[in-house]
């Protein structure tokens, strides 16, 4: 990765989810102004790659507001592609916070599959500030109500609606992200399960706002759709404004999608 450009950072996207990726393996330097970098480059997250004793690299994730995130599936696909290209392999591992390890597989020219791990559904694992039924959270805001909560390496709630385009996510997102039920704030998804069995999805990402794509949100959408009984299969396409992700749930959740350079 270190030879990609003179400034030692790369601009990439995973289905429209935009990143600045900084290779800091040689220095293990995390002393960057992440909010400034995000503002100057118009990216959703800033990703810093450092060395890991447990995996091929350690991936640090910073939101557009400078806050840290625990998981970013789309960024993992981008980093996975870079490392696999550098190493000449079709499999690498990425370490995240809490010693979580993501497995990445090359399945096409620029198509990467990521093992996102097991979804967590207990209220204290989301986490929530008080004990609740995570399949039916007691939240109602304008036309949104009765969301499902799940942790896919980071906390998510999913609302099911008849039309994702009718929801004013720009105004509702900040209120839901900062709801008192979520001590670590929350990622918000608006999901529409279509007759075809595919899912249309719009996302408000914690610390960033509306994004064109969010890999962990797509995983959350499939898991919660299945738990609610809206889907009878455990594999489907999730259609986001930035593109399509294939999500599979077989004990662990797997996400497959394309990457690109900006």
Swiss-Prot record:
InterPro entries documented for this protein: DAP_epimerase_AS, DAP_epimerase_DapF
Residues carrying the site annotation Could be important to modulate the pK values of the two catalytic cysteine residues: 156, 205
Molecular functions per Gene Ontology: diaminopimelate epimerase activity
Residues binding substrate: 17, 45, 63, 73-74, 154, 187, 205-206, 215-216
Location of the protein in the cell: Cytoplasm
Main location: cytoplasm
Keywords: Amino-acid biosynthesis, Cytoplasm, Isomerase, Lysine biosynthesis
Single GO BP term: lysine biosynthetic process via diaminopimelate
Active-site residues per Swiss-Prot or TrEMBL entry: 72, 214
Protein family (similarity comment): Belongs to the diaminopimelate epimerase family.
Function per UniProt: Catalyzes the stereoinversion of LL-2,6-diaminopimelate (L,L-DAP) to meso-diaminopimelate (meso-DAP), a precursor of L-lysine and an essential component of the bacterial peptidoglycan.
Subunit and partners: Homodimer.
Protein name: Diaminopimelate epimerase
Origin organism lineage: Bacteria, Pseudomonadati, Pseudomonadota, Alphaproteobacteria, Rickettsiales
Gene that encodes it: dapF
